């Protein structure tokens, strides 16, 4: 099985090392890192941060215990080598090494640039096998697109393009893992009208194939229309597009069912009828999985040559710098990432 390739290279017998990128420095990412450092998640993983000293200093007063557990380094030490007098520390690489003032709640050009610099450095560490997985904290897509990289649409596409992956759906997929439900998205960050144009038989087969290759298990395809079209009364896409794609998938030997009524398919997955739901557009899948996970879903990118996960929330500029950021989502993601690295997830995973 590929969990984002190469995951679990050494983690069956050793702690997984996870590298976390800071996200937008004006968001809650830096505070979340300090909260994580103040109360490390456990003995089954080792953490390293790629984060600006300036960003962490800006919120140091909110979590002083976390700051005390950081060790700023030029290069990552050997695994398990971040101790000081018997105390376990978290290695931090500053991707910018510039003194500046970070203002929580307002993303400026420097914050967008720092987010990209941290992401690129963290990716390089995973690709060099210095870490087993990448966990990304939220960036502001619009800020990066405005200040640094026109056309930027988010981590998923950016990371895929950096690996030479060309087409969403065929080559890589956005997926979300909740404790009792797993969802992949046929279309990703698209306006709804455009996303519906992307619901084609070819796209469905591409996405199903990607999901089978990188995860496996029983896959239920969500319908597009209420009641999955009600025999054509409420729409014919199920009969003309989705059902033929499912039939072809089954001819290929894939364990696929549907199209199922969108108002029932997610509950059936939670009850064990399937391992995955392939949702047709962003909010169809995300509303269901976020409701089920109660803020603790893990965003997992299938198809990358390394394991990458992320939280299911955004930068939260409205509460940045106030000391009220909740790190429970990040802790859930770390636990899920360790399980992915060990091959314990996803549910219904391929074993060969």
Where are these regions (language model features)?
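Anion-binding alpha/beta catalytic cores of soluble intermediary-metabolism enzymes, centered on
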Residues: 2-237, 243-352
